[in-house]
Amino acid sequence: MAENQNYGTGRRKSSSARVFIKPGSGNIVINQRSLEQYFGRETARMVVRQPLELLDMVGKFDLYITVKGGGISGQAGAIRHGITRALMEYDESLRGELRKAGFVTRDARQVERKKVGLRKARRRPQFSKR
């Protein structure tokens, strides 16, 4: 691919995204599909666009993204994290603004495991007094 592109890896829950950005017209391609085709939910599309909208760079970059693992929400979060990292590689002076918005920090929350003797991670079986 082109030499003038920047790369960022993003992760969220069990999803990981590889994001390549290069100067362009604002075209976003995720796993060979457009943003609208890939994410049916408007909330997921909004999450993906957040870093670009924050910096007023929506129409300035073309994004080529590959994402795998997890569900819709996790993938959207991973893409957002990847875009943020790629933008910081492009221009380090953007870090402060992105950090203030909370996009730089990796969201470390994971699904809590199910425990033996419980129905779910914390849900206990119904208690019967008699």
From Swiss-Prot:
Molecular function (GO) terms listed? RNA binding; structural constituent of ribosome
Supply the alphabetized keyword list: Ribonucleoprotein, Ribosomal protein
Q: Name one GO biological process term.
A: translation
Q: Name one GO cellular component term.
A: cytosolic small ribosomal subunit
Under SUPFAM superfamilies, the record lists:
Ribosomal protein S5 domain 2-like
Pfam families assigned to the protein according to its UniProt record, in alphabetical order: Ribosomal_S9
Q: List the disulfide bonds.
A: none
Give the family, as the similarity comment puts it.
Belongs to the universal ribosomal protein uS9 family.
This protein's name: Small ribosomal subunit protein uS9
- Annotated organism of origin: Erwinia tasmaniensis (strain DSM 17950 / CFBP 7177 / CIP 109463 / NCPPB 4357 / Et1/99)
